[in-house]
Amino acid sequence: MAEHLAAVLGTGQTKYVAKRTDVSMSGLVREAIDRALADSGSTFDDIDAVVVGKAPDFFEGVMMPELFMADAMGATGKPLIRVHTAGSVGGSTGVVAASLVKSGKYRRVLAVAWEKQSESNAMWALSIPVPFTKPVGAGAGGYFAPHVRACLLYTSPSPRDRS
């Protein structure tokens, strides 16, 4: 069986700001897709499948947004796969898209990883509910800090490095 190679043909990003009130979730994603397609010299007709990577749904306050955004992503009538790995979702989306090409199943796959966290309360979304943990409401930084410190305690070469 011949090995199929996978490559990134183009990229597209949107403006990084605290809030984009000028566009919807679909509009934000479409901006990035249009830029990626232009960068690659491709059109939606060239795309065989779409892989969408997005963190947990409660960050935007909408369940399964990839379904109502299918038209904006050029995925109508094409295979649409959702990747959900939270903090590593961007990298995981690329891996899934590359795997689909390398398998020989599809020739061109559009990989889209996105978040528009200004749509909901990200601090609430990152806080694990009681009774599973203490109600600190500290978000990702506050949640992971004790884990990082514990890792440093066991892996740092000297006591000075552990503080």
Q: What is the predicted role of each segment?
A:
Residues 38-39, 72, 103, 153:
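Residues at alpha-helix termini
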Residues 26-40, 65, 93, 144-151:
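Short, well-ordered amphipathic alpha-helical segments that serve as non-catalytic structural scaffolds
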Residues 154-161:
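Conserved small/polar residues in nucleotide/adenosyl-binding loops
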Residues 1-26, 127-130, 153:
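Condensing-enzyme catalytic core mediating Claisen C-C bond formation in acyl metabolism
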Residues 48-53:
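Short glycine-rich phosphate-binding loop at a beta-alpha junction
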